Each structure stands twice: as structure tokens, then as C-alpha cells.
Amino acid sequence: MTTDTLEKPRLSDTAQVDSQSIAPFPNSKKIYVQGSRPDIRVPMREINLSITPTEFGGEQNPPVRVYDTSGVYTDPNVKIDVRQGLPDVRSAWIAERGDTEVLQQKSSSFTQQRLHDASLDTLRFNHQRQPLKAKPRANVTQMHYARCGIITPEMEYIAIRENMSWQQAKEQGVLDQQHAGEHFGANIPDEITPEFVRSEVACGRAIIPANINHPELEPMIIGRNFLVKINGNIGNSAVTSSIEEEVAKLTWGTRWGADTIMDLSTGKNIHETREWIIRNSSVPIGTVPIYQALEKVDGVAEDLTWEIFRDTLIEQAEQGVDYFTIHAGVLLRYVPLTAKRVTGIVSRGGSIMAKWCLAHHRENFLYTHFEDICEIMKAYDVSFSLGDGLRPGSIADANDEAQFGELETLGELTKIAWKHDVQVMIEGPGHVPMHMIKENMDKQLRECGEAPFYTLGPLTTDIAPGYDHITSGIGAAMIGWYGCAMLCYVTPKEHLGLPNKDDVKEGIITYKIAAHAADLAKGHPGAQLRDNALSKARFEFRWEDQFNLGLDPDTARSYHDETLPKDSAKVAHFCSMCGPKFCSMKITQEVRDYAAEHGTDITPIAEDEVVRMIDVEAEMRKKSEEFREKGSEIYGKI
């Protein structure tokens, strides 16, 4: 037997979960909050905290619950096997609505072709489900149910998830101090109820991306009156990555807080890669279908047709993609407006459609067939992410006529989609200096009827290649505060190369910071509880609690250990920054102790005036006596 005749190992036999993605978070456990029925079990991560040291009062600190996107990967009671996919969450909910049917075969001709290609057997995900589709004349979107006055299990699940921090603060009655915030016209209630979720989806201010063919999904919501969400991008290219690497990026990204994942694969075996990703994803998956359609015509944009694109939409919808980026706003008349730009058209999808329009001198077929696309979307409950194909690629091009012209068209398309009860969010820039960001948010709300805004940053300056996660994180925090519903992460590799696992984590943590900062600035109920808990731990020198309450416990711990590696440093009442004699928090505590000992009341408001409260004359007499007792020598002997 020669090596040529040896059978390649099948991925369905060899694939393994990324071990780092299933490692438990320190001092944390997965908990589930049950809803009105046994199959509504909402996951959260509960961080257990240590007791406050006796010298600080000796009180028990209650655990802190945090929003958890990691799925069952961090549940030690669930056996993880990426070859089998994730447990089913939603199939019973979908079936009991009675408006779907099981297809006996895949509808896409491309899918059929791939299934009959024996050379792909080694790559195939073997446990494929038969696809669901809406029954004739039925509409299966969450928006349709919401407009019919129906509160779905998905909506109740989301209400429990979104309401977590507020409920926790209310129950504990501690650390519930929170600044009011400035919400710029958002309508954020004290309590998120299932009815509030329904009403926001019904009017189009929020979307629940939840394809009926993605039953593994843990429902989430995107909207300005909810917690700000973040998206992480993954995907192979013609030059790098494998299916296993992309699944590892997925599980790694959701571990650190990605609320959705976009698969932007442009390399080989896009169909098979996507199947593995969806079957192993507890978060919504988005794609840009024009990328795969372009691969089907060997990269020649002029050869694209509506028929090829339509088949691609159906292929991906039946796999379970939850939202599609569709660049239907790149109109023929807008393309010349980009000619004088510094960086022209930088969106890959936008440039593909611009080239097609110019080559045929015809209107964008995504625009002319938009209602046909809506028919497909509502048959599977795929949400629109209307793409900003003319977004600025440099701050010099920000807020120009091309960008805002497309945005106005996206507003028109939003209204068409809503006529079909199809869910919509709007994609936004890009590269925008800080003083021009709010104009983007205000115009989007006005033109698009408050449909959720989903932006890439924006990057606030162009001078920092290698640090664009920072340049964009600044803009992301600002636009999130102004009302943006979801922020698309940027990694340090932006403009330079494809991100690896470390880059994915750094991008996600950066954007979790931006999103949380926006929630704080908006005054989202309960958002400040985690900050308060960490601040209390910091003041009480509970180092392990500080690490564990942070977004990235591993990095915090490693930075601390670089200078204070011993276990004793984890209970020390100082850090490596100032040392034991200059720690401001230690000094403050000593001042409080002194005041308590001498009967002086120091309120939090008056702590900055503490020196005036202490009997200065008594202190001077005490020091004078100490000097005399030691022999009245200016320099003591050692």
C-alpha cells in the first residue's frame, strides 16, 4: 500500500475543542436562572468573592453575576465534543409554534453539489440537521410574532438575561450606587420585562437574530435600549487558517465576551467551515453572502448574477446563519461620489457591488431584488444587517456625500423590510474623528427609524497601525454612548493582517471595555454594580477578587505577578505601584481607623478634609514627646 492510497483522517473523527476555551474561570461557576417554563434556562457566570478582612469590617461579600456568552463550553457538567455540536436550546419552541416544515432535502443547488462531492467527506460535519422553512404564506420572524402581540420564549429568555444586573442590585441592596447617566433620548426602563422586549422588537428598535435553523442559539437582543453588544470577526482566507482554527477562534471569542460572531471566510471550503461554526456556536452567526457568491464565479465581480446570489442566501439560511450583511445601498449614482476620496471605497462588499454596477451600467441587483431577498429572510428568520459599502476608510472621507447618501437609501430599505416583518440593523463607519461621531448617530436614528446601529469602531485617527483596537475603541465607546446598539471589534492586526487567537482576545476585551463604558454613561440599570464590587475589593486589598471581577483575570494576575509573584503578595495591603509606605488606599484606611479610634466622624463626603478634622495640636505634642524619648538626636543611630 502506498501513501497515495492511505485515507485522510476525517475531521469528524479528529476535531477537538480548544482546551483554553473550556477552562473554568477562577472562582466562578456557571448558573442557570429558570424562566416560566423548565426549558427556559438562562446562563450566567457567578463570581464568588472572599470575605472582607477583619480590619475592614469583616463582612461577607455576595457573589456577582455577569452576562455570559461562553455557552456550555464553561459548564463542567456538559461534555463538550465539537464533532457532535452543541445541545439543542430552541427546537421545542420553534416546533410548538406550528408554522414551520421540515424540508426533505436542501433547497440550494450549491449545497446539493457539495453533499455529493466525495472528496469533501474528510471535512464534513456529519451530524447535519434537516433544514426548516416557514410553511407557505407563514412568517416566522421574531418581529412578526412581536407585532402579533406574542411574547415568545426567546423574548422571555432575553428579558431575564438583560435584567440580570438590575435584579441582582435590587436583591442584594449593596453596591447599588449608580450615576444617572446621559442617554440621549434612549428609553431604558428600570426593569427589562418580556413585554418590553416584545414592544422594542415590534417597532424595529431592536432585533433578535435567531434563524430557525440555529436551534443551538442562546437568544440575545441588539438595540439601543439594551446592553451594548459586541461582534467578533473570524474567517479563513486564501492564504491562511483551517476549519479547526476557525472553530477555536469562535469558542475563544465567545469565552471573552463576543455577543455575535461574523464568519468572513473567503478561502477554501467556505460551506463546510460555516457548518462547523454554526453547529458549535451558542451566539448568533452573521455572514456577508456576496463573499461566497464571488468565490462561485472565481472572483470575477462582473460575472455575479441574482440567481447565484439567491442560491447563496438560501444555502446559508438553511445552514442557520442568523444575519446577513447585504450591500443593497451601494447605488450606481453614488459610486462617482467616491472618486475624490483619499481612500475611495474600502468595503470589500461595497467595492464588489460598485464594480458590478459600473461593468453593467445597471443598478445594484441587491437593490432591485430587495423584496425578493425579504421573502427569503422571513422564511427562515434571518435578520438584515444592511451594509455600509461606502463607509469612509479614512478620517478625511468621514461624513461625506457618498456615505450619507447610502445611509439615506438604507433608511428606505429598512421601511421595505419592515413591511415584510423582517428584522433590520444598519451598519455604520468606519473612520470618523471624535467631533463628527455624534452626527453619524443622529442621522442614522433619523433616517432609519431608530433601527439598531452596528458600527466598525469608528476609528478616530489614522496614525496608529498596530494599535487600531485603541483608535477604534475610543470611537466605539463614544458612539455606544450616543445610542449605537452593537460594536464590531477591531484587532491590533487591522489593516495589517489576519488576526490570530491572541489578537481576537485583545480586540474583544478592548470592545467589552468600550461597550461597558457606554452602558455606564447611559445609566443602564445595574451596569455599575461590577465596577463597585471591584472598587470595594481594591480598597480592601482583596487581590484575587480584583483579578476575578475583571474582564480578563488572567492578564491582571500575570501583570501583578511580574513584580509581586509570591502568594503572600495576594493578601498584601499594598501593590507594586507605590509600595507599602505610599499606598494611598492604605493611608486612607489608616486615617479612617485613626478617626474611629479618636471618636472623629469621617463621612465619605468629608474624607478630603480629614486633615482638618484631626486634632493637629495633639499630634504635634505626641511627636514632640517621641523626639525627647529618643534622646533628642536629629539623626538616629542605626
Swiss-Prot record:
Residue numbers binding [4Fe-4S] cluster: 575, 578, 583
Subunit comment: Homodimer.
Main function: Catalyzes the synthesis of the hydroxymethylpyrimidine phosphate (HMP-P) moiety of thiamine from aminoimidazole ribotide (AIR) in a radical S-adenosyl-L-methionine (SAM)-dependent reaction.
Name the record gives this protein: Phosphomethylpyrimidine synthase
Entry-linked PANTHER family: PHOSPHOMETHYLPYRIMIDINE SYNTHASE, CHLOROPLASTIC, THIAMINE BIOSYNTHESIS PROTEIN THIC
Gene Ontology MF, one: 4 iron, 4 sulfur cluster binding
Native organism: Saccharophagus degradans (strain 2-40 / ATCC 43961 / DSM 17024)
Catalyses which reaction(s): 5-amino-1-(5-phospho-beta-D-ribosyl)imidazole + S-adenosyl-L-methionine = 4-amino-2-methyl-5-(phosphooxymethyl)pyrimidine + CO + 5'-deoxyadenosine + formate + L-methionine + 3 H(+)
Cofactor(s), by name: [4Fe-4S] cluster
UniProt-annotated binding residues for Zn(2+): 431, 495
EC number(s) reported in the record: 4.1.99.17
